[in-house]
Amino acid sequence: MAEAATEIPPTASNVTVFTFEEQATSSLALYGMSILCIIIGSIRSAQYIRTNIDKKRLIEGSITMREARKFPISASLVLFGLYLFFKPAAERFLWVARVFQILRVPEEYVQKINSTIISYTANTTTTGPSEPFLLRLASRIPQERVPEAIQNAATYAYTNLPTIQKAECMQLLTFLICFEGVNAFASLLKPFVTAFLKKMPLVPSFLRFNAPYLFSLKKGNKEMEEGDIEDAKKKETEYLFKIDFDRYDIIALLMCSPILISHLLKRHWITNNIIGVSFSILGIERLHLASFKAGSLLLVGLFFYDIFWVFGTDVMTSVAKGIDAPILLQFPQDIYRNGIMEASKHSMLGLGDIVIPGIFIALLRRFDYRVVQTTAESKAPQGSLKGRYYFVVTVVAYMAGLFITMAVMHHFKAAQPALLYLVPCCLFVPLLLAVIRGELSALWNYDESRHVDNEENRKKVDSGKKNN
């Protein structure tokens, strides 16, 4: 997920000037929601990981050192791809040409690029509908080089199939993001649905039984007769896709579906925040950092990533404004003037500024509770180990970093790379505490990699099941 920088509307002569009370209210609301997400998500993360370990399940979706090294690069590619997607064609090509000039590409190649841009975007400034770029590109291919069958198929597709433009792609992307967010909210709501259906009277008996379901796509690793794959050994098959759910998941999702419909129709800030908070809590719970070293590397990499894309370019803010989906938290600054339903001038905080520090703080929560113990800790007498409070201290550090971010944002009235302030607070404070307590080695070497879902660990689990 590309993260959006925290921002407020720029100052301009025709822009409403908000009072200190209005700005403070919106900032405190975002401040409270972000901290709530981190605390709840971290608590749920410790429970989730401990449950998986107790049931001898390997943890999927872990971020190890390998993933941490690649994450800033892959995130940059996704972010830049979205940026190019939102840019008009002419601006997109001119931007590429400027990059070539910065990279000191020979002038003759730059001139060829410019001539190509002028040729292919010549009609994009007219008032009438512009001809699709791919059609203009295809028209430049000599017809004698294209087989007649391909020409006929292309002509039929162009005249009969609906045209998929940027707007349609944006609608699909928005729907997918909103659906996943509502699904996350349903997961948070499920315990309450379960308690209601199990304990309340007059509930039909078929609803009291929580039937589990498994939807999967399995591939064989060798040739088999039809029907043999179902009974094949585990090592002879692999899952291409697998999702397990139960009846209460479906009921919770149906109960949350009005939020999805409402947000798709109205894009209100309340439904946006319901989806965004759910995304953040479940993301912190399920995105698993495998070790403190991996978490440190991830934070340092995204520290420079955030600075570059916010301060160095307009990419981050352009993508944040271009995606009309709940990828950030919002709270209106004009809520006192226009009311809850009509307020429309928002302060914003990107979900990445919550989830990225949040998964690191969740790791510290698991370190405090010794979810994974060393050999010495496992042999120590009950109650002899001293308590840890890295989680609480780092939450306070995050609060301080976020406060600094918002203060700088309001002072300069411009978008700020929040991780510039959050990463030093969340990384150096627990390290300093570990030095003071003499636990630097234990913290730095804290590792949950043996519970990560990979080939080596799967073999160990399978051999353990055979021995039992």
UniProtKB/Swiss-Prot annotation:
Enzyme Commission number: 3.4.23.-
Localization per record: Membrane; Endoplasmic reticulum membrane
Topology in the lipid bilayer: Multi-pass membrane protein
BP GO annotations: ecdysis, collagen and cuticulin-based cuticle; IRE1-mediated unfolded protein response; membrane protein proteolysis; positive regulation of embryonic development; proteolysis; regulation of nematode larval development; signal peptide processing
Function: Acts as intramembrane protease. In larvae, required for the complete shedding of the cuticle during molting, possibly by regulating cholesterol uptake via lrp-1. Involved in embryonic and larval development.
Keywords: Endoplasmic reticulum, Glycoprotein, Hydrolase, Membrane, Protease, Transmembrane, Transmembrane helix
Any one GO CC term of the record: cytoplasmic side of endoplasmic reticulum membrane
Family the entry assigns: Belongs to the peptidase A22B family.
Domains (record comment): The PAL motif is required for normal active site conformation.
Taxonomy, superkingdom: Eukaryota
Transmembrane portions of the chain: 23-43, 71-91, 169-189, 248-265, 268-284, 297-317, 344-364, 389-409, 416-436
Ranges per topology, Lumenal: 1-22, 92-168, 266-267, 318-343, 410-415
Effect of P417L: Embryonic or larval lethality. The few surviving adults are uncoordinated and have severely reduced fertility
Loss of function: phenotype: RNAi-mediated knockdown results in late stage embryonic and larval lethality, slow growth and pharyngeal pumping, uncoordinated movement, reduced brood size, middle body constriction, and muscle detachment. RNAi-mediated knockdown in L1 larvae causes incomplete cuticle shedding during molting.
Primary location class: membrane
Enzyme class: hydrolase
Protein name as catalogued: Intramembrane protease 2
A GO molecular-function annotation: aspartic endopeptidase activity, intramembrane cleaving
Motif placement: PAL: 417-419
Pfam families reported in the protein's UniProt record: Peptidase_A22B (PF04258)
Annotated glycan sites: N14, N114, N123
